[in-house]
Amino acid sequence: MHAYEAIEQSLTYIEEHLTKEISTEKLANTVGLSPFYFQRLFKRLVNKPVQEYVKLRRLAKVIENLKSTEQRILDAALDYGFSSHANFTRAFKETYGITPENYKKDLPMLNTFDKPEVSMNYVLVDEGVPLVVGNIVLE
């Protein structure tokens, strides 16, 4: 298994278990890596530490629920692993700059964190040869 495949597998695991407790050690064991190496690799490929990523994905799922249902803020937060209203409100406000209550009232557009694609799809480019991508020439 390539390193990026282990991270892809862990991202899928996270998505499927956002409503449960997710520890870095459990994720590392799930993909067969040491916790130390897993954390370094995850940060390098996802550009976020593991628990920060989990928090951002949980916030995104809560926002999705608040937009599409009449669920109470506290219930949505508890469903996605936040331990209390205060804990959720703090995380929400630090991330988005508004309280969950103000969000629910106005439903402004927020830039939520989506599951990244970490597969190693790339194009080899010869140096000195222009590359055309979407009507843009990269030299």
For the regions a protein language model found, what residue spans apply to each?
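Recognition helices and adjacent regulatory flanks at domain boundaries
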Residues: 11-16, 28-29, 37, 98
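Basic, low-complexity segments
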Residues: 25-46
